[in-house]
């Protein structure tokens, strides 16, 4: 808050008054980060692209956001209040999973698989990429391109060999 006040050349009480307190300011920050990440992911989930490109672009979109908004991502995954009425990382992942679900259902139909399983696979896929993103937040020994390539390798090669009935 002190940095914001100094940058805006106003006092801290003015900031608190404008946002209704620390919680209001924090909610604005979280909302801004959720919107930035969602915009990047929505652009990557363009259904006019080939499925492998959607996968790679989505992984890179998350990793690029983490790279350029490290503090914002850290707030989303670690510091955001659990009872926040504003957007949250988990609600964002749920929204992304719904978009992925529609893409997978279409692909499942083409592969003669039951599209009723698309919601489950969407959750697994989004969860995998989200967890890798959280890991990469602290472990930057690989470039985002290398990480995305390995995610694509695991997911794509696994998805290509799916069986209609895994039992």
What function would you assign to each model-found segment?
Residues 66-87, 101-105, 134-138:
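Amphipathic alpha-helical segments used for helix-helix packing
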Residues 47-51, 69, 111, 139-140, ...:
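Short coil/turn helix-boundary motifs
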Residues 7, 24-47, 53-64, 75, ...:
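Alpha-helical structural segments
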């Amino acid at each position: 808050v002190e940095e914001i006040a100094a940058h805006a050349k106003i006092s801290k009480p003015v900031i608190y008054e404008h946002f209704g307190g620390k919680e209001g300011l924090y909610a604005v920050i979280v909302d801004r980060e959720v919107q930035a990440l969602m915009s990047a992911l929505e652009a990557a989930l363009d259904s006019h692209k080939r499925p492998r490109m959607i996968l790679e672009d989505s992984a890179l979109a998350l990793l690029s956001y983490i790279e350029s908004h490290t503090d914002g991502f850290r707030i989303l995954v670690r510091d955001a209040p659990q009872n926040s009425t504003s957007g949250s990382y988990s609600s964002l992942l749920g929204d992304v999973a719904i978009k992925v679900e529609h893409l997978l259902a279409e692909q499942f139909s083409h592969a003669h698989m039951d599209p009723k399983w698309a919601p489950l696979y969407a959750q697994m896929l989004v969860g995998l990429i989200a967890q890798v993103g959280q890991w990469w937040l602290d472990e930057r020994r690989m470039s985002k391109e290398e990480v995305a390539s390995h995610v694509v390798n695991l997911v794509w090669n696994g998805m290509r060999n799916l069986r209609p009935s895994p039992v």
